Amino acid sequence: NPNAKTFDISRLGFDDVTLEKFKELVGKPTGLILLTGPTGSGKTTAIYAAIGFILEKHGNAVAISSVEDPVEQNLDWVNQSSLNPARGYTYPAALRSLMRQDPEVIMVGEIRDEETAEIAINAGMTGHLVISTIHSGSTSGTFARLINMDIEPFLLASTIMGVLGVRLLRTNCMHCATPYTPEAYALEQLRQFEGEEYLQMLIDQQGFYKGAGCSACSNTGFARVTHSVLDHLSKEHEIISFGINYQGDPHDYPFKIYPASTHNP
């Protein structure tokens, strides 16, 4: 297929720990894996890479189907379909059709409503591996979002295998990056996330830089988007059980989810 594109899971920018956990998750035979993050953060790319990893392991022996809005890249050995709401081909309708075909792996472009969520969770409970995205303010807030869709907490507890949050940051322009001193609160946050030893290493050996703006970057101070910041929750995390049962504001969770990795190719 000349329009097919290969996505390499090892080039997503995940650190070794997160990459192995992600591979472990997509290697499971059943359950629901969710990716969350803003538009353009790389969620779909990560899912395509996950499907590529499954195909690399099993070839076309595993039946994979997708419902997308729209299909962003053609994938070999994957039965892909695009939504067509004008003709009634919505996420719920498409998923019901897919369930009759009995695929082993199902990619759902996005869980947007209660009906889609119910079908995806039911598929994850009945012998399918479902990989999808959902818009949420945070990784832990994914559970509150699904509960607000009237999904029963016990269903989430038994179905969700893991949640991966993805963010992309812009890198400094290499032509105008100059040394600078971050504000005290930023240094304190870095100290809390990474520890005093890591912070001191940055100060002593690398320093901090900020793009001043030049003609090469159209005076923005930034280059291209290449820096990924990730956090993840897996079935083993205590916070999954807590998040499912938490009734308060997701932004007030007493747990803090710190980035699992940062990568700058």
Where are these regions (language model features)?
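Short, flexible helix-loop junctions that flank or precede catalytic/ligand sites
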Residues: 1-265
